[in-house]
């Protein structure tokens, strides 16, 4: 495969890189206890929330930034970040989406996320987050008819403080890791979902994250609780403008599944990845963890990672309930000078727990793509089983792929299977396609799509085609 083809395929324009010119209410740069108190005061939070933040901030001051991921970047100046920026509004509390600034509605429509009543998606409820705040949530009232709570976490703190206090930090504690502690101190919004006992959520729930301000970090918090026998499918998407500087995105996601509950969490991550020389792009340092607390509970993570200059995330499952199930399906595509260190942890505690890991890494350009996984069978995980499959594909001759599996088994009745492969798109494959009149670009697209099909099949139907298209767009021109 010629280097020109590879270059053309990789260097696709990023169509979400525009900036919305809108007046913002932003606090000064820098992080201190006063800034933490200011964020809490701006959001008029209950006392327990301020205590939570301050505890996290004090922990964070004692922690060191992790150096073990296989990624390299210049030191981050945490005093040069704006930790809260929100679009200026005429009213403190908006009663409906009709009161949202038209420029914001237009931004989300341009991103393919219409929020106005006439144009909104009919079977998907959306929480739209812009910089540090949620600007609106669709179908809240309709979902409430089934007892489903879907709102921003700021609203949940006002309307359902007991639920937030009970579950916030129960899966990812404030001192869990450096970036989770930072998030716990300064997060300003995110989504809250509560599915009551026995309810199957009647529609897909989705949150769309948009970073706009070039000096602002985004630190959202997502908390999803499924009570006994409840089920929900949730999708998140994200984009950001093209800046020459890097922005920090440090989110935390906590999922709690009680007896016989089922949570499916899907991500299509398309943050700005920087230019072909590695200038600009988002640092995506995220902590995601699900707790299968109840018997027969199930949590499934599906992710398609194509953006960010640097990605550092490991959506994980802690399988406490007997017969609980954890699943992780991932596609991580890197090109140009992107770096990704992603993977999962499956921690088996209960009896007869099961987990499956399917990871597909695709490396093109000068990028580096690492899979890092932990499978841990606890001493009481009688009859537990895990199956892991980690496949890497290299496009071109300058990309790198690494796999770091870690397996710990403390119960002799547990079974663990692990297989891994590395492949490269070869001249013989492209020649075979050419013989049938298929261009090199189409051939690469078809090979990648086939390589990823096990994961794409796990996405909700309406998003699978979008993700497949996104992979093709990201690779257009990698051959030439």
From Swiss-Prot:
It comes from the Bacteria. GO terms for biological process: iron-sulfur cluster assembly. SUPFAM superfamilies: Stabilizer of iron transporter SufD. Pfam families: SUFBD_core (PF01458), SufBD_N (PF19295). InterPro entries: Fe-S_cluster_assembly_SufBD (IPR055346), SUF_FeS_clus_asmbl_SufB (IPR010231), SUF_FeS_clus_asmbl_SufBD_core (IPR000825), SUF_FeS_clus_asmbl_SufBD_sf (IPR037284), SufBD_N (IPR045595). Belongs to the iron-sulfur cluster assembly SufBD family. This is Iron-sulfur cluster assembly SufBD family protein slr0074. It comes from Synechocystis sp. (strain ATCC 27184 / PCC 6803 / Kazusa).
């Amino acid at each position: 495969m010629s280097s020109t083809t590879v270059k053309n395929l990789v260097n696709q324009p990023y169509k979400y890189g525009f900036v919305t010119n809108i007046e913002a209410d932003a606090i000064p740069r820098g992080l201190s206890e006063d800034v933490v108190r200011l964020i809490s005061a701006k959001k008029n939070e209950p006392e327990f929330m301020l205590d939570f933040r301050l505890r996290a901030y004090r922990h964070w001051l004692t922690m060191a930034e992790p150096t073990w991921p296989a990624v390299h970047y210049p030191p981050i100046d945490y005093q040069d970040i704006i930790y809260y920026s929100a679009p200026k509004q005429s009213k403190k509390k908006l009663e409906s989406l009709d009161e949202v600034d038209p420029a914001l509605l237009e931004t989300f429509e341009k991103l393919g996320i219409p929020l106005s009543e006439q144009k909104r998606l009919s079977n998907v409820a959306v929480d739209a987050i812009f910089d540090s705040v949620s600007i609106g949530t669709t179908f809240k009232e309709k979902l409430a008819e089934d007892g489903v709570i879907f709102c921003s976490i700021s609203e949940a703190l006002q309307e359902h403080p007991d639920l937030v206090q009970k579950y916030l930090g129960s899966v990812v504690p404030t001192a869990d890791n450096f970036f989770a502690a930072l998030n716990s101190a300064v997060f300003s919004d995110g989504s809250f979902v509560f599915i009551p006992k026995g309810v199957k959520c009647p529609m897909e729930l989705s949150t769309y994250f948009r970073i706009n301000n070039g000096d602002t970090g985004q630190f959202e918090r997502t908390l999803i609780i499924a009570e006994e026998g409840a089920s929900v499918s949730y999708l998140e998407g994200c984009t950001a403008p093209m800046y020459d500087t890097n922005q920090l995105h440090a989110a935390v996601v906590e999922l709690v599944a009680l007896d016989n509950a089922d949570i499916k969490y899907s991500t299509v991550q398309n943050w700005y990845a920087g230019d072909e020389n590695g200038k600009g792009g988002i640092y995506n340092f995220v902590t995601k963890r699900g707790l299968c607390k109840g018997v027969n509970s199930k949590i499934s993570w599906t992710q398609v990672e194509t953006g960010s200059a640097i990605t550092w995330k490991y959506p994980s499952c802690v399988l406490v309930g007997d017969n609980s199930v954890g699943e992780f399906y991932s596609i991580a595509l890197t090109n140009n000078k992107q770096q990704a260190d992603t993977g999962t942890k499956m921690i088996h505690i209960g009896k007869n727990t099961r987990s499956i890991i399917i990871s597909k890494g695709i490396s093109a350009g000068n990028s580096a793509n690492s899979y890092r996984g932990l499978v841990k069978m606890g001493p009481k995980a009688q009859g537990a089983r895990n199956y892991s499959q980690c496949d890497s594909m290299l496009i071109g001759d300058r990309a790198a792929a690494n796999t770091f599996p870690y397996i710990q088994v403390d119960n002799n009745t547990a079974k663990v299977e692990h297989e891994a492969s590395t492949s490269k798109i070869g001249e013989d494959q492209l020649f075979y396609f050419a013989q049938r009149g298929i261009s090199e670009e189409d051939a690469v697209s078809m090979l990648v799509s086939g390589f990823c099909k096990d994961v794409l099949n796990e996405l909700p139907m309406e998003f699978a085609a979008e993700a497949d298209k996104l992979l093709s767009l990201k690779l257009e021109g990698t051959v030439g």
